[in-house]
Amino acid sequence: MRGFKADMTNTQPLKVALPNKGSLAESASQILKEAGYRQRNDVRDLAFIDPDNGVEFYYLRPRDIATYVGSGELAIGITGRDLLEDSNADAGEILGLDFGKSTFRFASIPGRSELSGSRIATAYPTLVRGFLESKKINATIVGLDGAVESAIRLGVADVIADVVSTGGTLKQAGLEVFGDPILTSEAILIERRGSIRDSKIDTLIRRINGVVIARQYVLVDYDVPKSSLEKACELTPGLESPTISPLQKPEWVAVRAMVKRNDVHAVMDQLWEVGARGILVTDIHSCRL
């Protein structure tokens, strides 16, 4: 990868870093597909060119992506917020992508919740060190590469600090989390701090943001009597305002609005109660807002 400094001119392809494997890899490629970018067909490919959009994708270890982007080797990348915070790379977060969510927590045997004077095993030493320093807690960090759940049982640590998604792995190891989360993580889009964005970067950010928003909303259409329109619009205010159209029946109107996906069934029930009929829900694949 030496020599592939991020070129910010439109004559050169935009170089983008993506996870090559792990929990983020498939979702990262999928969101780019939905944003109109071609992706590799073979998971063994380390690079792929999308000539239509002028983008080169490089598939790298998730932990290395912030380093490549922060050094200017690649212009932009997708990684985890936890990995960025632990990297010391000169890269910053652009946009949360609403997948790969987890928390970074301390855990130990049931009943133990003391950090001061403890040996803390973790694969994220920079992140943990920063937290301890911010809280003025004196503890010893035991750096491990990979799974740390066995560190307490094997006697090399008193506490572990690790990414927690469901907590199932910790329970199997006889551990439980304690204290507040050190960090709430998700997949994020990153760039080098202070870099100048060109039109290709702006387009990629805008497209991905459109997919992120579209996944969070649905489009709701319904007919409602004019006498109930105000109540119905209170339930479906949309992002700015709902679209209202006349119908052949003069006492009825048609309404269209974006509604939070997680709220849509409750909203449909409430619309029905105020007299709305013909309530339809449509997925949104992308948007520009």
Regions found by a protein language model. Give the residues of each.
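Short, structured active-site "lid" loops
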Residues: 54-73
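Small-molecule-sensing regulatory modules
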Residues: 3-4, 8-55, 59, 79-103, ...
